[in-house]
Amino acid sequence: MSERVYIFDTTLRDGEQSPGVSLNIREKLQIAHQLVKLNVDVIEAGFPFASPGDFKGVQAVAREVRGVSVAGLARANAADIDRAWEALCEAEQPRIHTFIATSDIHLQHKLRMSREAVLETAVEAVRRAKGYTSDVEFSAEDAFRSDPDYLCRVLAAVIAAGATTVNIPDTVGYAMPDEFGAFIAYIMDHTPGIENVVVSVHCHNDLGLAVANSLAAVRNGARQVECTVNGIGERAGNAALEEVVMGLFTRREKYGLITGIQCEEIYRTSKLVSTLTGMPVQFNKAIVGKNAFLHESGIHQDGVLKERATYEIICPTMVGITRTNLVLGKHSGRHAFRQRLTELGFELHEEELNRAFVRFKELADSKKQITDEDLEAILDETIRQVPATYELDYLHVFSGTTVKPTAVIGLLIDGQFVQEAACGNGPVDATYKAIEKATGRKYSLVSYVIDAVTGGTDALANVTLKMRDDDHRVYTGRGVSADVLEASARAYVNIMNKIVYDERTRKHE
């Protein structure tokens, strides 16, 4: 029987540290529930001591999500560990993940502590965490740049103190695969008691080697990999979950290892994380990128038509990318719409289905055929959203080479109709100024990205917008329409609804 590799997902903690990413509690819960469907072993829900928002996010996941271990990060001090437990105490399977750096550069310049002091601090932290839960993980920050023999001493000490998982990070993404594999092998051979715990790795992607280093570690005895969906994370990101999992699966004859991941949920999870974080997946991204299973070369196309295995080592359906001959359009009924959503893996409540179907019909009037990508965009816009305080009723824009761009907008604000007009430096600017006049709200633009969902002149425009509020929180909004300006307006209205939702949530806490 093959050995198990545990998948520790840190999308909600390390992934959310990506510049410009900020998830509200509702969004964190959506991702957490999808991670349960994906069947990860551990969800690291956040860093409870870092901020009240992080604490509430971890607490919400701990309370609501079942069937998975929920971890909270804590520095190796009493205040952090106590706060982590306060957030995690209602979890079905709580894990406290405590850490301290072990490399000399961190000890000298950041911690200003001796090696012995760090070792004692690590042991005390594990003992304190162990007083709360039997599941305790210890991480030696910047482990790869640490003295190997000192690191082995620290790990042996925390294992003796009760740690059940020891994590060996390549915190700055400095390692090469052969080096990191040998490093893990050395630790496995020179750390007393290590055979009684799970050895974990956490690799960063600064040199583009996070996945390769993770697989090298697994090859040499690691049995937990810490990773994020789409590889998101601070700086250049983390090891991509989908690449680690499919690497182990596709080359199972080499590794002889399994994970518990439900691979058919990979693509859906990737799309959800991309939508909620506002971080698009690069087209040539392995496993989940738009081009991952496309073949343009004539020779490649000929080979794939004759036998897919000539140029495809993974079947797209294996990761949840489906193919269909069913085409939806303006004459399609609710039954066909629901059937296709079911085939794509979306399970909607009746109210959600009704909202999505209304939006589908609106878009089908302006687009001859609605593709699977269009359907996913519709669901991103209409289903995965907060309650609507603001709703777009209509938008009229006047623009041209000799005309001052002017927008007239009609909004429903808590059901009351409001109309405003504004001029701007361009049609989008005029539209946003009209929205700001109507709502009395104005935010700072961080980024504006427009993408065609599919090809063709009737393709849906997908606008992803990021705005910063007065408290420097960054919000992501998305709008979809065959009209670029309408999509832009919908994205801004979406952001305003998120901000209002967060404000009301904070008032009631």
From Swiss-Prot:
Top-level lineage group: Bacteria
Subcellular location(s) of the protein: Cytoplasm
Amino-acid positions noted as binding Mn(2+) in the UniProt annotation, renumbered to this chain: 14, 202, 204, 238
Chain ranges of the Pyruvate carboxyltransferase domain: 5-267
Molecular function GO labels: 2-isopropylmalate synthase activity; acetyl-CoA C-acetyltransferase activity; manganese ion binding
Presence of the UniProt keyword Amino-acid biosynthesis in the record: yes
Protein name from the UniProt record: 2-isopropylmalate synthase
